[in-house]
Amino acid sequence: MTTPNIITRKIAPVLPAEYTEILDRVRYQWATCLVLTLDRPLSDMYWLSIADDLPFVACVEHTNFMKPEEYGGNHIVYLSNYASSGNPVLEMDARQVLEHYTPGLKVINPDFDPSWVRNAWFFKDPGGQPVIGTNYSRSIPPFATGIAGLYLANTTQVYPEDRGQNYSLQLGEEVARLIHADVRAVAARKGAWI
């Protein structure tokens, strides 16, 4: 499984108690993403990581990487952020989030006007980012869940690194090696060759 711990608990409710105790130690920030289709470019940048005091942490203008013609002439912009439970943004719809983000969009492009927006969608995920606290290493679940043949590889396990595609690939390779070793061990016990 590659799901956040909170989803893993819902999908596999019969996990051993010791394992679920480890899963439950991790707290998450929500990931949010406002996706906009614009009738014109917002900027000439593909990816902006935002460290300023704006209401989002990344602005990815996908159509500065792929041609707008591949998206019906639309300019696709992703605005992502993290939010703690209880953040008012989590209760907003796409139009409300757009209104909240508009001052930040005007920092990127002072000419930006909400009339440029053809459509907007707002997505949120409660398992967006593990919160790394003191003694976090005690909260990292092992890959083997305690249920034969069921393994977990998710962002809680990339510590001390930060989550990212490269680390996800490394986790996948580690778990694949573990599964291969486990399958070989089971086969050996049964007298089979692998």
Question: Where do the protein language model's features map onto the residues?
Answer:
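Short glycine-/acidic-enriched loop or helix-start segments at secondary-structure transitions
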Residues: 9-13, 132, 162-163
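Hydrophobic (often cysteine-bearing) scaffold residues that line and stabilize catalytic clefts
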Residues: 94-97, 168
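Surface-exposed helix-capping loop/turn segments at secondary-structure junctions
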Residues: 107-117, 181-189
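Alpha-helical packing segments of well-folded alpha/beta enzyme cores
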Residues: 101-104, 175
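Mid-domain catalytic core of redox enzymes
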Residues: 1-91, 95, 103-108, 141, ...
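FAD-binding beta-loop-beta segment adjacent to the flavin cofactor pocket
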Residues: 66-72, 124-159
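A short coil-to-beta-strand element that immediately follows conserved catalytic motifs
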Residues: 28-31, 109-125
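A conserved FAD-binding loop/helix module that cradles the flavin
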Residues: 154-183
